Amino acid sequence: VVGCPWQPWC
């Protein structure tokens, strides 16, 4: 996953 646009704890 690049940039993690769906994880609030990137």
Curated annotation (Swiss-Prot):
Q: Mind telling me which GO cellular component terms the entry cites? A: extracellular region
Return the protein name: Contryphan-Bt
| Free-text note on domains in this protein's UniProt record | The cysteine framework is C-C.
Organism, per UniProt? Conus betulinus (Beech cone)
Residues of the signal sequence?
Answer: none
Family assignment from sequence similarity: Belongs to the O2 superfamily. Contryphan family.
- What positions are modified (D-tryptophan)? 6
Instruction: Establish whether keyword Secreted is in the entry.
Output: yes
The entry lists its GO molecular-function terms as: ion channel regulator activity; toxin activity
Lineage, top ranks: Eukaryota, Metazoa, Spiralia, Lophotrochozoa, Mollusca
Note the superkingdom of the native organism. Answer: Eukaryota
The record's keywords, sorted A to Z, are: Amidation, D-amino acid, Disulfide bond, Hydroxylation, Ion channel impairing toxin, Neurotoxin, Secreted, Toxin
Q: Which InterPro entries match?
A: Contryphan_CS
Q: Where in the cell is it found?
A: Secreted
Any idea what job this protein has?
Its target is unknown, but this toxin may modulate voltage-activated calcium channels (Cav) or calcium-dependent potassium channels (KCa).
Residue positions where Cysteine amide is found in the record: 10
Q: Which residues carry this modification: 4-hydroxyproline?
A: 5
What further note is attached to this protein's record?
A: Exists in two forms, due to cis-trans isomerization at 4-Cys-hydroxyPro-5. Exists in two forms, due to cis-trans isomerization at 4-Cys-hydroxyPro-5. The cis conformation is the major form.
Distribution of this protein across tissues and organs: Expressed by the venom duct.
Disulphide-bridged cysteine pairs: 4-10
